[in-house]
Amino acid sequence: MLLCAKGKILLKNDKTDFTQGRILPKLAFFMLPILGALVLQAAYGAVDLLVVGRFGSTSGLSAVSTGSQVLNLVTFVVTQLAMGVTVLIARYLGEKRPQYIGQVIGGAAVVFTLLAAALFVVLVFFARLISSLMQAPAEALDLTASYVRICGSGIFFIVAYNMLSALFRGLGDSRSPLIFVLVACIVNVIGDLVLVAGFHLDAAGAAIATVAAQAVSVICAIAMLLKKELPFKIHRSDFKPNPQCKKFLGIGLPLALQEFLTQLSFLALCAFVNRLGLEASSGYGVACKIVNFAMLIPSSLMQSMASFVSQNVGAGNKKRAEQSMFTGIGIGLVFGCAVFALVWCKGDVLSGLFTADAAVIANSYAYLMGFAPETIATAILFSMVGYFNGNDKTLWVMVQGLVQTLLVRLPMAYIMSIQPNASLTMIGLSAPTSTAVGILLNICFFLWLKRYENQTCA
């Protein structure tokens, strides 16, 4: 329920109080560590591909490319589900009701543990089936299944990391998750070099390094949480299903479902590309790693926007929440245009960082040419989505995401993939096309919501 309160509720720590002060520096200060964490996460995934591309086989490169798509689906869905925890914690801080946060965390621990157990069974025991459904090239099928199975065995660490990061971001602390990812990235680089370059374990070595890195980062996160001075208390009795579970799931489930179908569309896209051959598959995998870097600023804006907006909505300051969205769009457009120019003009050079295979580089660059406008379009879309997430309009976020995925991106990518002499450029163009539709939908909903709230508060 939206309140039309005029007063501001202040938090004890000015750095984590988003309800007062200039928006741009506050948002930038909170966003930068999130951006840093995302940069390291992208580097984390890129290192696997880079090391396997240099010291492994082309089949191993395809296996990591396809297998990482599966793991990305799981990770992104868990992240969106955890967004419910972030938003609810930030809301309680804004409303000055921290006594409920312990129940949120305890309930979340139970829910995410059950989720991790289910994912473990699926990824470990059905790895080969999943790889087959992804239409992994025959020569890379065994390596892909091995990669998925090994990473699936460490899914508890991946889920735990995302839940703990959501907790810290909800408290307005975006620096601690940055430290966790930095530790994981260092461990992963060392592991890749030892297992892939040293012991020549190919895709399996990259998977083992990934699991080890996640385990170390979770240990660091728990240690930091125990030492941190928290504005609330956690009791043993909080670790059970409780009324707060329904609340954060009500926020997070629509986002998780939307993200699941979005990532499923990218898995389908990966399958479409895999049918075009090993070189196209490997080229698409390289392009996806570059895309991950290109999307960093819009993604960090979306994550930071949710906490920023949620605090202000909780404090009854809707105008400031709207202003933060427009500030985020401005930041995103500045960087989005620069990234577009880099990807469009130097996509082949960027692709060459991951492999020396000329055919793979050419396929990667072809996809990037179609995808490039997405770097500008998402600057607008992701800031709006972050605003709606923080404003507890996650059901709408799910609806607009499904329209983009099911009615635009997936049909267009499929149609382009079955054309004679199918072009990776046209397949890549399905992403910015669907985002443009999403922007139009969100603008219409924003205008409608603003009119509705004004009438309600009149």
Language-model features: locations:
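Short alpha-helical transmembrane segments in multi-pass integral membrane proteins
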Residues: 1-31, 89-156, 198-253, 309-374, ...
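N-terminal transmembrane alpha-helices
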Residues: 18-50, 54-55, 69-84, 88, ...
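Transmembrane helical elements of multi-pass membrane transporters/channels
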Residues: 29-48, 150, 184, 213-217, ...
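Transmembrane alpha-helix boundary and packing residues in multipass membrane permease domains
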Residues: 34, 38, 50, 87, ...
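Helix-terminus/linker motif at the lipid-water interface of multi-pass membrane proteins
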Residues: 39, 43-62, 131-138, 194-201, ...
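Small-residue-rich hydrophobic transmembrane alpha-helices
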Residues: 61-121, 158-177, 283-347, 378-400
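Hydrophobic transmembrane alpha-helices of multi-pass small-molecule transporters
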Residues: 73-76, 188-192, 217-222, 293-296, ...
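Short runs within selected transmembrane alpha-helices of multi-pass transporters and secretion channels
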Residues: 82, 151-169, 177-185, 206-219, ...
